[in-house]
Regions:
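C-terminal substrate-binding/catalytic lobe of Rossmann-fold NAD(P)-dependent oxidoreductases
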Residues: 3, 14-18, 22-40, 131-249
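NAD(P)-dependent Rossmann-like dehydrogenase/reductase catalytic/cofactor-binding core
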Residues: 230-285
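Rossmann-fold NAD(P)-binding glycine/threonine-rich loop
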Residues: 73-97
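General beta-strand structural signal in soluble alpha/beta enzymes
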Residues: 71, 97-101, 127, 150-151
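Rossmann-like NAD(P)H-binding beta-loop-alpha module
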Residues: 107-127, 136-139
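Rossmann-fold NAD(P) dinucleotide-binding segment
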Residues: 45, 52-74
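Glycine-rich Rossmann-fold phosphate-binding loop(s) that bind the pyrophosphate
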Residues: 9-10
Length: 285
Protein backbone atom coordinates (compact mmCIF):
# COMPACT_ATOMS: atom_id res chain seq x y z
CA UNK A 1 0.00 0.00 0.00
CA UNK A 2 1.18 3.50 -0.83
CA UNK A 3 1.25 5.72 2.25
CA UNK A 4 -0.08 9.13 1.21
CA UNK A 5 -0.18 12.18 3.49
CA UNK A 6 -1.96 15.48 2.89
CA UNK A 7 -0.40 18.85 3.68
CA UNK A 8 -3.03 21.60 3.71
CA UNK A 9 -6.66 20.90 4.51
CA UNK A 10 -8.63 23.35 2.40
CA UNK A 11 -10.98 22.39 -0.41
CA UNK A 12 -8.37 20.35 -2.29
CA UNK A 13 -7.01 18.69 0.85
CA UNK A 14 -10.48 17.60 1.95
CA UNK A 15 -11.26 16.20 -1.50
CA UNK A 16 -7.89 14.42 -1.56
CA UNK A 17 -8.77 12.65 1.68
CA UNK A 18 -11.85 11.17 -0.01
CA UNK A 19 -9.87 10.18 -3.11
CA UNK A 20 -7.19 8.40 -1.06
CA UNK A 21 -9.81 6.49 0.91
CA UNK A 22 -11.34 5.24 -2.34
CA UNK A 23 -7.99 4.14 -3.84
CA UNK A 24 -7.46 0.39 -3.45
CA UNK A 25 -3.66 0.71 -3.43
CA UNK A 26 -3.33 3.60 -0.95
CA UNK A 27 -3.74 4.43 2.70
CA UNK A 28 -3.95 7.82 4.40
CA UNK A 29 -0.74 8.49 6.33
CA UNK A 30 -1.89 11.68 7.99
CA UNK A 31 -3.30 15.16 7.48
CA UNK A 32 -1.03 18.09 8.24
CA UNK A 33 -1.80 21.78 8.49
CA UNK A 34 0.50 24.63 7.47
CA UNK A 35 1.90 25.17 10.97
CA UNK A 36 2.36 21.49 11.89
CA UNK A 37 5.84 20.05 12.30
CA UNK A 38 6.89 17.74 9.47
CA UNK A 39 9.86 16.39 11.41
CA UNK A 40 8.38 12.95 12.09
CA UNK A 41 6.14 12.58 9.04
CA UNK A 42 5.90 8.97 7.85
CA UNK A 43 4.71 8.81 4.25
CA UNK A 44 5.82 7.62 0.85
CA UNK A 45 4.36 10.65 -0.85
CA UNK A 46 2.78 13.92 0.28
CA UNK A 47 0.12 15.89 -1.55
CA UNK A 48 1.09 19.52 -1.03
CA UNK A 49 -2.34 21.18 -1.04
CA UNK A 50 -1.19 24.63 0.04
CA UNK A 51 -1.51 27.92 -1.85
CA UNK A 52 0.81 27.95 -4.86
CA UNK A 53 3.24 30.48 -3.42
CA UNK A 54 3.85 28.27 -0.35
CA UNK A 55 4.43 25.03 -2.25
CA UNK A 56 8.17 25.25 -2.87
CA UNK A 57 9.00 25.79 0.81
CA UNK A 58 7.17 22.64 1.88
CA UNK A 59 8.25 20.56 -1.11
CA UNK A 60 11.91 21.28 -0.36
CA UNK A 61 11.50 20.15 3.25
CA UNK A 62 9.81 16.90 2.21
CA UNK A 63 12.09 16.06 -0.70
CA UNK A 64 15.10 16.48 1.61
CA UNK A 65 13.65 13.57 3.61
CA UNK A 66 13.38 11.42 0.49
CA UNK A 67 9.59 11.79 0.45
CA UNK A 68 7.92 12.23 -2.93
CA UNK A 69 5.74 15.30 -3.43
CA UNK A 70 2.78 16.18 -5.61
CA UNK A 71 1.61 19.76 -6.06
CA UNK A 72 -0.83 21.73 -8.19
CA UNK A 73 1.37 24.79 -8.78
CA UNK A 74 -0.69 26.86 -11.22
CA UNK A 75 1.25 29.95 -12.32
CA UNK A 76 1.79 28.84 -15.91
CA UNK A 77 4.67 31.21 -16.65
CA UNK A 78 6.64 29.92 -13.64
CA UNK A 79 6.11 26.16 -13.97
CA UNK A 80 9.43 25.43 -15.66
CA UNK A 81 11.43 27.41 -13.09
CA UNK A 82 9.45 25.76 -10.26
CA UNK A 83 10.24 22.30 -11.64
CA UNK A 84 13.91 23.18 -12.12
CA UNK A 85 14.13 24.50 -8.55
CA UNK A 86 12.88 21.20 -7.10
CA UNK A 87 14.78 18.87 -9.42
CA UNK A 88 18.24 18.96 -7.74
CA UNK A 89 16.99 18.25 -4.22
CA UNK A 90 14.71 15.46 -5.48
CA UNK A 91 17.56 13.83 -7.36
CA UNK A 92 19.97 14.23 -4.45
CA UNK A 93 17.62 12.46 -2.04
CA UNK A 94 16.21 9.79 -4.36
CA UNK A 95 12.72 11.26 -4.55
CA UNK A 96 10.19 12.23 -7.21
CA UNK A 97 8.31 15.53 -7.36
CA UNK A 98 5.42 15.89 -9.79
CA UNK A 99 4.54 19.55 -10.18
CA UNK A 100 1.49 21.34 -11.57
CA UNK A 101 -0.53 18.15 -11.20
CA UNK A 102 -4.08 19.47 -11.45
CA UNK A 103 -6.39 19.65 -14.44
CA UNK A 104 -4.85 22.82 -15.89
CA UNK A 105 -1.96 22.73 -15.70
CA UNK A 106 -1.94 18.95 -15.50
CA UNK A 107 -4.25 16.69 -17.46
CA UNK A 108 -5.15 19.47 -19.92
CA UNK A 109 -1.41 19.66 -20.61
CA UNK A 110 -1.56 16.01 -21.69
CA UNK A 111 -4.49 16.76 -24.00
CA UNK A 112 -2.64 19.66 -25.62
CA UNK A 113 0.44 17.46 -26.08
CA UNK A 114 -1.56 14.68 -27.73
CA UNK A 115 -3.31 17.18 -30.01
CA UNK A 116 0.08 18.56 -31.07
CA UNK A 117 1.31 15.04 -31.86
CA UNK A 118 -1.83 14.41 -33.94
CA UNK A 119 -1.59 17.70 -35.84
CA UNK A 120 1.99 19.05 -35.79
CA UNK A 121 0.94 22.23 -37.59
CA UNK A 122 -1.96 24.26 -36.28
CA UNK A 123 -3.29 26.36 -33.44
CA UNK A 124 -4.63 25.30 -30.04
CA UNK A 125 -7.11 27.35 -28.01
CA UNK A 126 -7.77 26.63 -24.33
CA UNK A 127 -10.96 28.25 -23.09
CA UNK A 128 -11.58 28.08 -19.33
CA UNK A 129 -14.88 28.48 -17.56
CA UNK A 130 -17.13 29.98 -16.78
CA UNK A 131 -16.21 29.01 -13.26
CA UNK A 132 -14.32 29.79 -10.07
CA UNK A 133 -10.55 29.75 -10.30
CA UNK A 134 -9.12 28.45 -7.03
CA UNK A 135 -5.65 29.86 -7.62
CA UNK A 136 -6.90 33.31 -8.58
CA UNK A 137 -9.35 33.32 -5.67
CA UNK A 138 -6.58 32.51 -3.17
CA UNK A 139 -4.38 35.19 -4.74
CA UNK A 140 -7.14 37.80 -4.49
CA UNK A 141 -7.83 36.92 -0.84
CA UNK A 142 -4.16 37.50 -0.05
CA UNK A 143 -4.21 41.08 -1.36
CA UNK A 144 -3.96 43.78 1.29
CA UNK A 145 -7.37 45.31 1.94
CA UNK A 146 -9.39 42.27 0.83
CA UNK A 147 -11.51 40.59 3.50
CA UNK A 148 -12.87 37.90 1.17
CA UNK A 149 -12.87 37.25 -2.57
CA UNK A 150 -14.04 35.01 -5.40
CA UNK A 151 -12.44 35.09 -8.86
CA UNK A 152 -14.61 33.90 -11.75
CA UNK A 153 -13.03 33.03 -15.11
CA UNK A 154 -15.10 34.01 -18.15
CA UNK A 155 -14.08 32.66 -21.60
CA UNK A 156 -14.21 35.29 -24.35
CA UNK A 157 -13.03 33.07 -27.20
CA UNK A 158 -9.78 32.23 -28.93
CA UNK A 159 -8.15 31.09 -25.70
CA UNK A 160 -8.66 34.51 -24.08
CA UNK A 161 -10.36 35.14 -20.76
CA UNK A 162 -11.81 37.80 -18.53
CA UNK A 163 -11.49 37.69 -14.75
CA UNK A 164 -14.43 38.94 -12.69
CA UNK A 165 -13.12 39.35 -9.15
CA UNK A 166 -15.75 39.88 -6.47
CA UNK A 167 -14.24 41.31 -3.29
CA UNK A 168 -15.42 42.20 0.17
CA UNK A 169 -13.27 45.10 1.30
CA UNK A 170 -11.70 45.45 4.72
CA UNK A 171 -13.20 48.33 6.68
CA UNK A 172 -11.74 51.67 5.62
CA UNK A 173 -10.18 50.37 2.40
CA UNK A 174 -10.60 52.16 -0.93
CA UNK A 175 -11.81 50.15 -3.94
CA UNK A 176 -9.54 51.84 -6.49
CA UNK A 177 -6.44 51.26 -4.36
CA UNK A 178 -7.25 47.60 -3.77
CA UNK A 179 -8.15 47.14 -7.43
CA UNK A 180 -4.70 48.39 -8.45
CA UNK A 181 -3.05 45.94 -6.04
CA UNK A 182 -5.00 43.07 -7.60
CA UNK A 183 -4.23 44.10 -11.18
CA UNK A 184 -0.52 44.31 -10.30
CA UNK A 185 -0.42 40.71 -9.04
CA UNK A 186 1.17 38.16 -11.42
CA UNK A 187 -1.97 36.03 -11.30
CA UNK A 188 -4.03 38.81 -12.87
CA UNK A 189 -1.47 40.54 -15.08
CA UNK A 190 -2.33 38.73 -18.32
CA UNK A 191 -6.12 39.00 -18.67
CA UNK A 192 -8.78 41.73 -18.69
CA UNK A 193 -10.12 42.08 -15.17
CA UNK A 194 -13.19 43.52 -13.49
CA UNK A 195 -12.94 44.10 -9.75
CA UNK A 196 -16.37 44.35 -8.17
CA UNK A 197 -16.95 45.32 -4.52
CA UNK A 198 -19.78 43.39 -2.85
CA UNK A 199 -21.21 43.07 0.65
CA UNK A 200 -20.70 39.29 0.54
CA UNK A 201 -18.97 36.96 -1.94
CA UNK A 202 -21.17 33.98 -1.01
CA UNK A 203 -23.67 34.46 -3.89
CA UNK A 204 -20.77 34.17 -6.35
CA UNK A 205 -18.93 31.27 -4.70
CA UNK A 206 -18.98 27.95 -6.57
CA UNK A 207 -16.76 24.92 -7.08
CA UNK A 208 -17.91 24.50 -10.68
CA UNK A 209 -15.52 25.07 -13.55
CA UNK A 210 -14.78 23.73 -17.00
CA UNK A 211 -12.65 23.86 -20.11
CA UNK A 212 -12.95 23.59 -23.88
CA UNK A 213 -9.70 22.82 -25.71
CA UNK A 214 -9.86 23.20 -29.49
CA UNK A 215 -7.18 22.65 -32.12
CA UNK A 216 -7.33 23.32 -35.84
CA UNK A 217 -4.43 21.70 -37.61
CA UNK A 218 -2.75 19.67 -40.32
CA UNK A 219 -2.17 15.90 -40.26
CA UNK A 220 -0.06 14.22 -42.97
CA UNK A 221 -0.30 17.36 -45.10
CA UNK A 222 -4.11 17.43 -44.96
CA UNK A 223 -5.58 20.56 -43.36
CA UNK A 224 -8.88 21.22 -41.59
CA UNK A 225 -8.37 18.64 -38.85
CA UNK A 226 -10.70 19.70 -36.02
CA UNK A 227 -9.89 18.41 -32.54
CA UNK A 228 -11.74 19.24 -29.32
CA UNK A 229 -11.92 18.21 -25.68
CA UNK A 230 -14.47 19.55 -23.20
CA UNK A 231 -15.41 18.98 -19.59
CA UNK A 232 -17.49 20.54 -16.85
CA UNK A 233 -16.19 19.67 -13.41
CA UNK A 234 -16.07 20.25 -9.68
CA UNK A 235 -12.74 22.04 -9.40
CA UNK A 236 -11.28 20.83 -6.07
CA UNK A 237 -12.63 17.29 -6.52
CA UNK A 238 -10.98 16.80 -9.90
CA UNK A 239 -7.76 18.54 -8.86
CA UNK A 240 -7.46 16.26 -5.83
CA UNK A 241 -8.20 13.12 -7.84
CA UNK A 242 -5.47 13.98 -10.34
CA UNK A 243 -3.00 14.62 -7.53
CA UNK A 244 -3.79 11.20 -6.06
CA UNK A 245 -3.27 9.55 -9.44
CA UNK A 246 0.05 11.37 -9.73
CA UNK A 247 1.03 10.07 -6.29
CA UNK A 248 0.74 6.57 -7.73
CA UNK A 249 2.87 7.60 -10.69
CA UNK A 250 5.53 9.13 -8.44
CA UNK A 251 5.94 5.91 -6.47
CA UNK A 252 6.25 3.88 -9.67
CA UNK A 253 8.88 6.28 -10.98
CA UNK A 254 10.80 6.14 -7.71
CA UNK A 255 10.72 2.33 -7.82
CA UNK A 256 12.43 2.47 -11.22
CA UNK A 257 14.92 5.08 -9.93
CA UNK A 258 13.59 7.90 -12.12
CA UNK A 259 14.37 10.61 -9.59
CA UNK A 260 13.82 14.32 -10.09
CA UNK A 261 11.02 16.79 -10.75
CA UNK A 262 8.51 16.29 -13.54
CA UNK A 263 5.26 17.57 -15.04
CA UNK A 264 2.41 15.36 -16.20
CA UNK A 265 3.66 15.37 -19.81
CA UNK A 266 6.88 13.63 -18.72
CA UNK A 267 5.05 10.62 -17.27
CA UNK A 268 3.89 7.43 -19.05
CA UNK A 269 0.06 7.47 -18.76
CA UNK A 270 0.04 3.86 -17.58
CA UNK A 271 1.68 5.03 -14.34
CA UNK A 272 -1.40 7.03 -13.36
CA UNK A 273 -3.88 4.15 -13.14
CA UNK A 274 -4.15 1.26 -10.63
CA UNK A 275 -3.68 -1.40 -13.30
CA UNK A 276 -0.76 -3.63 -14.21
CA UNK A 277 0.60 -3.64 -17.75
CA UNK A 278 -1.58 -6.50 -19.00
CA UNK A 279 -4.77 -5.05 -17.52
CA UNK A 280 -4.05 -1.59 -18.89
CA UNK A 281 -3.41 -2.82 -22.41
CA UNK A 282 -6.47 -5.06 -22.48
CA UNK A 283 -8.78 -2.37 -21.09
CA UNK A 284 -7.36 0.85 -22.55
CA UNK A 285 -5.52 0.06 -25.77
Amino acid sequence: MIKVAILGYGNIGKAAEQAIQKASDMELAGIYHHNDSLEDIQADVVLVCTPTREIRHYANLLLAKGICTIDSFDIHTEIYSHMQALKPIAMQHGAVSIVSAGWDPGTDSLIRTIMLAMTPEGQTYTNFGPGRSMGHTVAAKAIQGVKDAVSITIPIGGGKHQRDVYIQLEEGEDLQTVQQRIISDDYFAHDPINVIAVDSVLPFDTHNHGVLIQREGVASGISDQQLSFAMTINNPALTAQIMVSCARAAIRMKASQQYGAFTTIHIPPIYFVPLDEEQAIKILV
